[in-house]
């Protein structure tokens, strides 16, 4: 078996041709494929993060085992569950001007929730864009999950301001949003640590997927023993 994880956009990249090419390669390599888009928020992760999960089972094992995608949890965590007692960690502050503007944005709000004159001056050329503006001056809410944790804490079109303070999330806060344990160590400078966290698969989502892989292998082992006994 194999597991392949990627962003949901892979399904539509180049009008679907990229993923179709990959599926063709997997088929020629002798694998039967199953796929599903999973949202980490439904698997114990306080973050909206959709990922395409592709499972491959070798053709000669089809019929001897199967893979079932994990079911959604009954409780979906929010930022209140992970931020209020989060240990301190390295981070990157906003400049003084951006900090003062973010102080005007309410939790759960974004650029439309402040004085249009201030928003327009901040957004500059982005003000006239037809789309791609919902991430500008975006502030998280304790009562909602985080948006997708990214590799950089303060890009203008993908901002994620802390709900209680006018600053980006720290590395450790992002790690909590990815459900890393607090004793997990990240390496390198602050920028490198942000990238490690942002590129990771959320721990709780990975665990749910892996449990089902173990179950599939247990089924295969049991069927193999039965065949040998016969």
What role is predicted for each listed range?
Residues 1-48, 53-57:
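Conserved Class I SAM-dependent methyltransferase catalytic core
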Residues 25-28, 51-196, 200-230:
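S-adenosyl-L-methionine-dependent DNA methyltransferase catalytic core
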